[in-house]
Regions:
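Glycine-rich phosphate-binding loops that contact phosphosugars or nucleotide phosphates
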Residues: 35-116
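Cofactor-/ligand-binding subdomain signature composed of acidic, glycine-rich
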Residues: 1-37
Length: 116
């Protein structure tokens, strides 16, 4: 498929996702509500990071808490310590981003709250 094929199909996929929105985010909402998180940290790169950057201000306003967006490399090297008590969300458009998977492995190894 070419990029134009994805662009032409995007409105259909968006409609499908909106119809299933409660189902698609149920686990994330359950985890978020069951914890005592004071921040949200989104770990992403490339187009996933761009999408997270676009959503950041809205999420921060809606949740009334700090929301940060960091690359997987920065997360593993130094961005994992602050803010404490953050829910970490690892985002990968394809699900195969090796750097994002490495960050998720770091989260799991260090018993950090994480959703992917």
């Amino acid at each position: 498929m070419k990029m134009l094929d994805y662009v032409q199909r995007a409105h259909v996929r968006m409609g499908e996702n909106l119809e299933r929105s409660s189902e698609l985010v149920a686990l994330l909402v359950d985890i978020f509500q069951s914890g005592s998180f004071n921040a949200l940290r989104i770990v992403a790169s490339g187009s996933s990071r761009h999408a997270a950057d676009c959503a950041r201000d809205y999420l921060q306003d809606a949740l009334q808490m700090q929301v940060s967006v960091v690359t997987p490399e920065a997360f593993v090297d130094f961005e994992h310590t602050y803010p404490r008590h953050a829910l970490n969300i690892a985002v990968s458009q394809s699900g195969y981003s090796t750097n994002t998977i490495a960050a998720l492995d770091y989260m799991r190894t260090h018993d950090m709250a994480a959703v992917a």
